[in-house]
Amino acid sequence: MNDFFVNIERTVKVTAEDIDDIMCSALEGGINYWCNKAEVVGKYLGEYASEQISRGGTLKLHDSEEDEVYELTLEKFLKGIQLAIQHNYYADYDWCNGNELDTCNVDASVADVIIQLSLFSDVIYG
């Protein structure tokens, strides 16, 4: 008997708090093995660098192995979330339940993958 597959589209709500939580996990351990510096572009839009993206700002992420600097924006970040969900990265962590995120289940590894997908559309480190 043959198996058949259908493509399902869904809309997932991502709050500013979700973004801040994921960025905090990324900057406080998730990306530190490949990124040695996160630099706020312009003025701080929140109290911490982790709050920059949710407020429409930009972070420059400095590669610790290459002489490269990558710019992370809200648009790129949301694309990273989309790719992580579409490709079922860490789906067993239940960080995306139905139509919203559960950032209590986003650890440093999940945050790292989201940031890499945001910047490179692929996971190239780790």
Each PLM stretch: what is its role?
Residues 1-64:
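Long, contiguous N-terminal structural blocks used for assembly/anchoring
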Residues 10, 14-18, 22, 68, ...:
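Alpha-helix boundary/N-cap detector
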Residues 99-125:
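Acidic, proline/glycine-rich low-complexity IDRs
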Residues 31-35, 89-96, 122-123:
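Residue-level signal for secondary-structure boundary elements
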Residues 64-66, 122-123:
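Generic structural motif
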